[in-house]
Amino acid sequence: MRSRYGSDGSDQASLQVNAATAVARLMPSARVVDATLWYIALQGVMSYAASGWVKLLGRPWRQGTALSGVMRTSTYGHDGAWRFLQKHPKFEHIATAGLLVFESAYPLVYLAGPRVGALVSLSAMSFHVLNGVVMGLGRFVWGFAAFHPAILYTTHRQSARSGGYLLPIASASLLAAVVGVIQIAALHRRRLVLDGPPFRENLETRSGNVLNYGGKLKGASVLVVMENALFATQEHYGWITSALDRADDVDFITYDRAGYGASRLNAAKNRTGQYLIDDSVEDLVSLVSTLHKPGQRLVLVGHSFGGEIIRRAARRIPSEVLVGIVLIDSTHPSQFASSALQSEGLQLIRDGQAQVGTIVNLGFGSLMERPEWVEQLPRRFRRIANNQYRDGRMWTAGRREIDAIARELDIEEPPQLEKLPHTKVSIISASRTMEDPDAGRMQVEMAEYYGAAHAHSIFKATHDSLLTDPLVAVRVAGVILDLACTTEEAK
């Protein structure tokens, strides 16, 4: 049974409080009641602290502009509050800074004494009431109010003890032990990621980067090479490669760009040079020139940012070798320069990924929830993909690439589409993408520019589900096979 319960903080707060009080009711001894009250209090204190610490990682919060950003959203926004903040930016900066300090320093309530603790709880409840009025988060008032009787109880108990600093010391020791275990798990996960699965191999490119690749190389007449999106690894192509594997006349290769998975950057170049999109293009060309067999017809497939890479690579591969490219919901080189919404979206992605990347690079990937798309992949790839998602390498590599996109594409005069006169082009777009006016326009423009003989809009598909949904991915694989077979017949 599916339910939306538990999808927000108020549900989670209520669950923690109700579960603990149920235990206290079932075992009504003084020690059990005391322990459950401490549990509720510490859950409440850490919920405020964690919220503040995560906000500190976000650039809009540090710049003091996050509140107006929230107020302009359709979900939690409030037109009057947004207009007020626009007229009084200094107030927004002060309010944002105050909120960050208040939440981040909340655990210090145990050092301040019961009177200060009561004032802090009163301030917290006032904050929740304000959120309820402005943002419509009425349930948060009652969900988080249930924490505060326990917090007040424990601050009084702590001040009454002779060893007043015993709890902070014990809590710090326990926290250090937990962090130690998490860091050991992170080191083990990093080793698994760097080793890569045993069914893949490594190849050193002309740039000195080492690419980890896999696939089927049996000397078929057509070779399909697949390029990943941003913040994505070759496991995303699992359903598509499963379909291609059943085609006798098609070989295929998937790989991870340098920095992702078990693929490694040239250490010397990484220290001295700034990443360019063309660096990945050169690696792809080097990979193809090494693994492509004489006489094979080549088809390149690129998803999202991978589409931009294969589009550039197509200009550098001999036309007698490259016979087709498949652009799957591909990046358009002008999409950020020609659309303010797309440019703003790119910045939001950069900010969001920076927050997550910082947490993961600090070794706390174990605390991240297993994403739904991992569960949609073929079973053999799920553990690999989950380890990569929780490891900092993927987030560091993605941040390096998204910064390059901002420098090279989000500019006044971005590069333009270039003709591929001897190469067939198939364009696949998700229906959700086509519903967006700007993104849909870009997909149509690419199809018209290349005169794409095969332009497909896949119904009930999103940008990600084109690869991760097995029912959708098999249709994408069909388009790839159609192009591969067409090029074979045209030989």
Task: Walk through the language-model features, giving the residues of each.
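Conserved HGGG/HGGXW glycine-rich cap/lid loop of the alpha/beta-hydrolase fold
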Residues: 216-264
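Membrane-interfacial catalytic/cofactor-binding modules of polytopic membrane enzymes
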Residues: 44-45, 49-102
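A short loop-to-beta-strand scaffold at the N-terminal edge of the catalytic core in hydrolase folds
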Residues: 206-216
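Active-site loop/oxyanion-hole signature of alpha/beta-hydrolase fold enzymes
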Residues: 257-301, 317
